[in-house]
Amino acid sequence: MANIVYKLSESEIQHLLQQITFETSQLSPGMKARTKYKQSVINIYNSGKVMFQGKNAEAVAQQLLPDHTTTSKNSSSSNQSSGETLAYNHYNCIGSDEAGSGDYFGPLTVCAAYVSKENVKILKTLGVDDSKKLNDQKIIELAEQLITFIPHSLLTLDNPKYNDRQAIGWSQVKMKAELHNEAIKNVTQKINCNELNYIVIDQFAVRGVYQRYALSSLPYPEKTKFETKGESKSLAIAAASIISRYAFVKHMDHISHKMKQDIPKGASNKVDLIAAQIIDKHGIETLDLISKKHFKNREKAQNLVTKKYK
């Protein structure tokens, strides 16, 4: 299926909206309008980008936007990976990654995403990259576009469930293995697996440990690869990373709104201070509902509160 992307001005978008009928209600986050026209799907995003999808995408784009040239050109050899790493972007891949594992506050989110080799160009055009290089605003903008057309599964382990599992002896590695495997299985049920070439997991454990902790077998073990710094090697992992980070950021925004104060990410001294403030205002039980209890930040925050009242 062809995918073509244009970046339009607001006046150009308004002109496009007047040419044919678009649906503007009950849309995915980040989407301004959507329609089906001549066996093609047209998505208009709040970012100003317009995506044409379908076998007639190019012809429809030329009809509706005759003065524009597509921005989704073939990239050069940037698809190639060095060393022994496979050039995953030449293949149809499921990638998986997580967010929140190093953050005291907030949940653990895991996403698996399927990127066909035909969609590699479109992801590059949109600016998909390692989520660690992107700020929250860009993460939200990209994720709200990706979730409209990339088959994916997003799982969130909230803090109460995370803490319950940790209390009965689950390590974070075990939690991640179980969630990654579940998300990957969910995606395999959404695609034609005869066309799937590889499953690429951003490595947090060696294969043997992952298989032992995953609670169920790998869907396609012969196709499964583990890669360190996977976001830079596979756009499927990069897409999964962005969507999982998006879910984490939105959840953190929800916590901040609920607590009526900014809740920082990470596990720094600033986090200790905010945690101490929450204990002081609301009690340790409230803190435990929005944080990972086994992090050392909890003890440090309690010590700060104790010192305050000495």
Curated annotation (Swiss-Prot):
InterPro entries: RNase_HII/HIII, RNase_HII/HIII_dom, RNase_HIII, RNase_HIII_N, RNaseH-like_sf, RNaseH_sf, TBP_dom_sf. It is an enzyme of class 3 (hydrolase). Keywords: Cytoplasm, Endonuclease, Hydrolase, Magnesium, Metal-binding, Nuclease. It comes from the Bacteria. GO terms for biological process: DNA replication, removal of RNA primer; mismatch repair. It holds the Pfam family RNase_HII. GO terms for molecular function: magnesium ion binding; RNA binding; RNA-DNA hybrid ribonuclease activity. HAMAP family: RNase_HIII. PANTHER family: RIBONUCLEASE (PTHR10954:SF23), RIBONUCLEASE H2 SUBUNIT A (PTHR10954). This is Ribonuclease HIII. It comes from Staphylococcus haemolyticus (strain JCSC1435). The gene is rnhC.
